[in-house]
Amino acid sequence: MFIKDAYNMRALCTALEQSAPDTIINTSKEENNSYYCATAHLLRTDVCSLVNRVGIEPLKSGSILSTLEELWQAVGIIYRLYEWQHVSDIDTNFKKLPNNSDFGLVFSVLDCDIGYVITGKKDSKGNIELYDPKNSLLIENDDIKKYLYDENFHRFCIMLIISKSELEELSRESCDQKCIMG
């Protein structure tokens, strides 16, 4: 299990746009301005600036974001190396994950400033379980879409799935690229 904290995704994207415009590769904004997506390569100084602006606390119990270096890697992975996807693709993406694996899922609900990072497991039979670190709820297969998608309010999630092995691999790649770029 990894990345157990929630943080303000919209503020992070806004700060990213303001603090490091030269590093932005691609940004997009929905017509209703409800959310931002950004893809960028972040340097260490950019992360320091983002931490100061957004108020992310890198030292939190139970989190891998225990140092600024790890925060840089996590933010870099989320915003530089992955694309956001609509929650309707959730089944397809879960099927791609290998059985007996841990993974993380990042989502942000429209009209809600907070983006959450939750963890999950895929067992040997392919069943999915999600764990919400905020209230320690266990969300099982039948309730996952209900948890992530509210038809009554026409809200949906922007999501990112990271397998644990991918996270470790991309952390190394991110660190290597950062070191190369100085």
From Swiss-Prot:
Stretch forming the signal peptide: 1-24
Gene Ontology terms: cellular component: extracellular region
Role this protein plays: May function as a virulence determinant.
Keywords noted in UniProt: Plasmid, Secreted, Signal, Virulence
Disulfide bond sites: none
Organism of derivation: Yersinia enterocolitica
Primary location group: secreted
The protein, known as: Protein YopQ
Subcellular localization, as worded in the UniProt entry: Secreted
InterPro entries, per database record: YopQ (IPR016505)
Gene: yopQ
